[in-house]
Amino acid sequence: MSLFVAVENIEKSFPLSGGNEYLALKGIDLEIKQGEFISLIGHSGCGKSTLLNLIAGLELPTDGAVSLEGQQITAPGPDRMVVFQNYSLFPWLTVRENIALAVDEVLRDLPKEERQAIVEEHIQLVGLGHAADKPPAQLSGGMKQRVAIARGLATRPKLLLLDEPFGALDALTRGNLQEKLMQICEENHVTAVMVTHDVDEAVLLSDRIVMLTNGPGSKIGGILEVDIPRPRKRMDVVHHPSYYSLRSEIIYFLNQQKRVKKLNARKVTTVARHGLEKVNLEIGYVPLMACAPLVVAQEKAFFAKHGLDEVSLVRETSWRGIVDGLTENYLDAAQMPAGMPVWMSVGGQGGSPLPIVSSLTMSRNGNGITLSKALYDEGIQTVDDFRNLLRSTADKQHIMGIVHPASMHNLLLRYWLAANQIDPDRDVQLRTIPPAQMVADLKDGTIDGYCIGEPWNAWAAQKEIGFTIASDLEIWNGHPGKVLGVREDWANRYPNSHVALVKALLEACQYCEDPANWDELRELLSDRRYLSCPKEYIQFSQSTADDLAVPHHRFAGAGVNRPSRTEHLWMMTQLARWGDVPFPRNWVEILERVCRVGVFSTAARELGLSEVVNYQRSTPVELFDGVPFNAEDPIAYLNSLPIHRDFSVAEIALDQPRPIAAA
């Protein structure tokens, strides 16, 4: 495809009463190739239709330029046809006459017979031969929109522009017209730009989906490539492995924009009380069993006990929401996968590094690797069986789900695969999927398995759609699971609040560890505010003799909660091993700043937990394969691993200034 439409640094303002201006779009850059179908999606008021009008020439930009085939667009033209949500048909003309009016005006140089043939061709193209002589009053809404599409295509435009063309139609008619438009565009290689609010419509029709942020000053927040091959059929699209991940990405973006809008609309002030710099905290979490300490601290008033009497727990659907919440400053703290503090501190999220402090390990264990029942039915019961299957079906794509690159799920799954001579990037494909979606994807057959925290392994086993092929007891018993994370600048600004937060959660961890509290804990976690799942799927166990499918969370005990720099270093090496981040040349400095043992020790000492303060973990990091981790020479350790990507070593500058939310 060659470059066809260029939108270059567009800015568009509209005058307001009183001499003011409203900035609708700012800094829009977009290149469209010939034959592409582009969808523009975003909340109302984000400038989707404004951008479409600029491409159509119905509006002119305040700054920047739009060009078609190298020619700047300065006015409407017949090379660009717009199909609006309203049908815009002349009520006194028939279907044939409405189309002919446009054809006769635009293609006037063609012989009459040829123009008539074009009209008839496009009437048949949209399936309206039986209604060609009817006026609009005798047509349904879907038929009227077909006339509008036929009229737009009949003039042979270079670019078809659609402004929510199916928004006013019922679901059945909308679905039929989407299929028809997709067929027409594919068969005729039409270049199209469409405005839509419909996520499924965007995925079905588009080659790329452009997501616009909220206005004023709306910009492109992201562009998704739709890797679903053409020609497409609706059910093939729904069952394609990329469908749910694309859909989830768009929904996540739209939900984040909605949240940002709400946050911008309210004025948040820092509330200091009880000798603490801030007591009104927003703490993020993802609904997994490992969030139990946060739920207990809230429901059993441990937060309030330690002076944090205005805590709100913010439920996120994915770990990306946690990253965005800390990056954008609308979360004070968060439950995190154990590898995320290091990952963000070295810049894994993109952009400059964001130092994250971890002063508490909230849970250990609680993960598992699940494969589909379909694989079990094929005789896959061990990792050797799985490896043999992969080698015998090398031409087939095998997909495993993970929740985030920095999660222990990803690091443990990759380690387990590589230690069993399975390359996690070449023999399988790892796909990032929100935790709650894993089971649905496994059931639907779009993935072959996943590594995730509970209750999703137990859920799959009890629903008989998957089986646990390996638990964390087998891979690394006692590995860090979830940690408390805060921004370093937040920790420095609110040191007393930070200690109070660790104290409250440390008490909550001890509560969660006590088997006498597990029945109540199951009730709390199953509530719709938290995990929103049947409590029979929420199981706890401290016995390693139990079935491997039973979770073995550890929330407290000797060495459970104290953060370990050696463990963080191991995670740092694994992230570098697979090319997610460079290995930091200044790794000692980064570990000292990420792993704040002093804050943990202060909190534990003030709670009277001297045995926790004085405990020193003596067991080295060693996983199931018996390969010792060389914490003295991590580069040599990385080079000794038989399967790894080419990794780089770089100095990571942590002291670049970043704004923190104003008090």
Curated annotation (Swiss-Prot):
Alphabetized Gene3D superfamilies for the sequence: P-loop containing nucleotide triphosphate hydrolases, Periplasmic binding protein-like II
Predominant cellular place of this UniProt entry's protein: membrane
Keywords: ATP-binding, Cell inner membrane, Cell membrane, Ion transport, Membrane, Nucleotide-binding, Translocase, Transport
GO molecular function, one term: ATP hydrolysis activity
Keyword Transport recorded: yes
Membrane topology (UniProt): Peripheral membrane protein
Protein location: Cell inner membrane
Region CmpA-like: start-end pairs: 281-663
Enzyme Commission numbers on file: 7.6.2.-
GO biological-process terms attached to the record: monoatomic ion transport
Keyword set includes Phosphoprotein: no
Residues at which ATP binds: 42-49
Induction or repression: By carbon dioxide-limited conditions, probably via CmpR.
Domain ABC transporter: 5-239
Pfam families: ABC_tran, NMT1_2
A single cellular component GO annotation: plasma membrane
Stated family: Belongs to the ABC transporter superfamily. Nitrate/nitrite/cyanate uptake transporter (NitT) (TC 3.A.1.16) family.
Subunit-level organization: The complex is composed of two ATP-binding proteins (CmpC and CmpD), a transmembrane protein (CmpB) and a solute-binding protein (CmpA).
Function: Part of the ABC transporter complex CmpABCD involved in bicarbonate transport. Responsible for energy coupling to the transport system.
Protein name: Bicarbonate transport ATP-binding protein CmpC
Organism of derivation: Synechococcus elongatus (strain ATCC 33912 / PCC 7942 / FACHB-805)
